[in-house]
C-alpha cells in the first residue's frame, strides 16, 4: 500500500497540516498508521468529513440575538443589549430615565414608579428605541439606504412632542438648518444629496471597523434630521456591525466626553481617541458574551479586534 505524509495529505485535501494531524489522532482516517513519529496516511484515503456544527450553537452575534429575541428568552444577551444600549444612547442625549427605570419599561411594558419630573418624551423614546433595536436585529442584512435610515428615525420619534410640531419632519430630513455645539452641519437644502453620496460611498467601501466609524462621523456631520441624529447614527452602527461581523459596541454614558471629543478630533484628522473609545465599548459587549455563555463568540470577537488592530498598525 502506498502512503502519503501529513503535508501531502494537507495539500491534497485543502487542510492545514495541524488539522490532518488531529484527524489522525482521532481515528478519522481509515488505515492510518504511525511510523516512528510520523503519520502514514493511505494514498487513496478520502478527506475526512467536516464535523457537523452543534445544533443551536450561534455562529455570530446576530444569530444569537435573533434566537434569543424570537425565543423571548429573558435575562440573556438580547435582554442586556436592549437595556444597556437604549439606556446609554438615550442618556448621552439627556434622558432623565435611570437604567433601572429603562429596564422596568422593557421588561414590564409599564411605567412603574417614574418621578413626575421625567419628561414624557423620555419614556416614549425609550419604548420606541426598543422597537428600533428589534428592527435592526431582524433586518440587519438589508442594504443601508435612505429609506432604511428614515424609517429608524420615524420609529424613534413616533408619538413624541416633536412629532406634533409643524416644522418637524418625523421620518424625513430636516427642514431647518441646525448646529451641533460649534460644528456647522449640512444645510437642510443639501441633505438629500449629501446622504445619497454618503450611502453610495459606504456601499462600495471596505467594511472595516475604521471605515464604519468614518461613516458615523460623516453622518453626524451631515446631521440629516432635526433631532435624533445621534441615536439614529448609533443604531446604524449597530446594524452594520451585526451585518458585517464586526463586534458591536455600547458607548456608555461615562464615555460620553471621550466619544464627543473623538468625533471632533476625527474630523480634524486624529482618529485614535474615537477608535479607542469604541473598542472599549466592544469590550463591554465581549464581557456580555462571556457572561451569557457565548464563549466561542467572545473568542471570535477578540480575534476580530486583533485583526483590526493589526490592519491599523500595518497601515501606519
Predicted features, each with a name:
Residues 1-12, 17-29, 34, 40-316:
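FIC/Doc superfamily catalytic core
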Amino acid at each position: 500500500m502506498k502512503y502519503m505524509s501529513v503535508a501531502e495529505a494537507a495539500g491534497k485535501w485543502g487542510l492545514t497540516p495541524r488539522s490532518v494531524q488531529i484527524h489522525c489522532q482521532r481515528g478519522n482516517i481509515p488505515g492510518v498508521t504511525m511510523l516512528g513519529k510520523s503519520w502514514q496516511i493511505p494514498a487513496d484515503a478520502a478527506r475526512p468529513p467536516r464535523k457537523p456544527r452543534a445544533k443551536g450553537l450561534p455562529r455570530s452575534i446576530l444569530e444569537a440575538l435573533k434566537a434569543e429575541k424570537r425565543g423571548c428568552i429573558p435575562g440573556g444577551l438580547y435582554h442586556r443589549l436592549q437595556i444597556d444600549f437604549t439606556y446609554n444612547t438615550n442618556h448621552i442625549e439627556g434622558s432623565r430615565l435611570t437604567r433601572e427605570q429603562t429596564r422596568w419599561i422593557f421588561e414590564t411594558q409599564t411605567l412603574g414608579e417614574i418621578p413626575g419630573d421625567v419628561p414624557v418624551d423620555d419614556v416614549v423614546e425609550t419604548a420606541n428605541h426598543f422597537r428600533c433595536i428589534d428592527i435592526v436585529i431582524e433586518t440587519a442584512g438589508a442594504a443601508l439606504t435612505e429609506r432604511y435610515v428614515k424609517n429608524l428615525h420615524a420609529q424613534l420619534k413616533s408619538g413624541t412632542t416633536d412629532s406634533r410640531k409643524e416644522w418637524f419632519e418625523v421620518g424625513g430630513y430636516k427642514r431647518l438648518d441646525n448646529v451641533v455645539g460649534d460644528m456647522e452641519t449640512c444645510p437642510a437644502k443639501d441633505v438629500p444629496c449629501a446622504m445619497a453620496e454618503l450611502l453610495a460611498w459606504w456601499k462600495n467601501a471596505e467594511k472595516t471597523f475604521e471605515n464604519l466609524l468614518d461613516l458615523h462621523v460623516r453622518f453626524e456631520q451631515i446631521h440629516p434630521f432635526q433631532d435624533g441624529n445621534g441615536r439614529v447614527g448609533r443604531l446604524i452602527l449597530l446594524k452594520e456591525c451585526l451585518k458585517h461581523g464586526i463586534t458591536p459596541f455600547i458607548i456608555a454614558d461615562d464615555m460620553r466626553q471621550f466619544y464627543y471629543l473623538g468625533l471632533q478630533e476625527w474630523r480634524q484628522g486624529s482618529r485614535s481617541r474615537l477608535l479607542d473609545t469604541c473598542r472599549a465599548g466592544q469590550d463591554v459587549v465581549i464581557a456580555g458574551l462571556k457572561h451569557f455563555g457565548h464563549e466561542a463568540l467572545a473568542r471570535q470577537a477578540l480575534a476580530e479586534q486583533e485583526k483590526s488592530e493589526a490592519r491599523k498598525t500595518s497601515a501606519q
